[in-house]
Amino acid sequence: MKYTSAELREKYLKYFENKGHKIVPSASLIPENDPTTLFTGSGMQPMLPYLIGEKHPLGTRICDSQKAFRAADIDDIGDNRHTTFFEMLGNWSLGDYFKTEQINWIWDFYVNELGLNPKKIYISVYRGNDHFGIPRDDEAVALWQEKFTEK
């Protein structure tokens, strides 16, 4: 169950292509039409216009492997969580599916496609923000709990 980065990327993109996603190439590391930043720092950054309502020319299901560079992390390089340049795999629903499908698919990808041991998978869920009145994501918590209790 060892994969090179190229094999993992290809497996991920093919998996979501089979779920009806259109594959888009990585956007430039130097963002176009975004004077707020020097570099593309996340997979979401090039998708932002579509996440806030602009129609994507390829439809409502998009998948990519976005190259990202984070200059702010340079001082933290060397620990087990920070890198400067990396690729973010993303599958995007632009008004199509939501949490149930996303959680089911990514679990299937991890466990059945990659063969990961479910007992070694850790999930984080948005805990909310009292200051802004945003509640914890209890729906996602419940959906993930179902995955971890399935036989």
Please report, for each region that a protein language model flagged, where it lies by residue.
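Structured aminoacyl-transfer and RNA-binding surfaces used for tRNA recognition/handling
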Residues: 1-151
